[in-house]
Amino acid sequence: MDDLKIVFSDVDGTLLDSRQEITPRTLRALKLLQKKEIPFVIISARSPSGIEPIVRKYGLRCSIVSYSGSLILNEERQIIYHRGMSRVEAAKILDFTAQQHFDMAWGAYSFDQWVTPDRTDPRIEREERIVKATAQQGVIADMIADEVHKLLFICAPAWTDTIEATLKAQFPQYEIVK
């Protein structure tokens, strides 16, 4: 461990196990990193508010890379980097998906704000439970900033490939992943 300069970790399935917990062995390793003053960075597609409960619960001191790199915060949670699409562009994508009549729920993320048109949708409620964060009922126009870092579409697994392919074909300028 003495030759390590920095350690990066994804959250789901890497840092957290299937029960959404850090194992005792992993936690010991993280505490050793802190003791040796080796920087630890959490990287996730989650929002900052979806990462912070983990940081607080386990007493971690780390920078975070959220939205798969669209927003980077240092240990003091100051913004180091951010890049997203405009609300207008996000609205175009959402309008397109509405015209397709896809059976899905969506959430839009800007810095640490998460909006969705229906907080009572079971798919959104499940996401809230997983990330231990709360969505705000609203639409893109309700977002405080003009920068959208992530659009999340939640659908039945049988629809995922179709929706992904359709969005990639219509919006090749954006990174669309499942």
Set out the residue ranges of the language-model regions:
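Conserved acidic, metal-coordinating active-site core of Asp-based
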Residues: 103-178
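Short loop/turn elements that form and flank the Walker-type P-loop nucleotide-binding site
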Residues: 2-3, 37
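Conserved residues at the C-terminal ends of beta-strands
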Residues: 10, 67, 154
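Asp-based phosphoryl-transfer active-site loop
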Residues: 3-19, 93
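Active-site phosphate-binding/coordination module
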Residues: 21-123
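Short loop/turn motifs at secondary-structure junctions
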Residues: 3, 59-60, 147
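Short, basic/glycine-rich phosphate-binding loops at helix/coil junctions
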Residues: 9, 71-74, 142-146
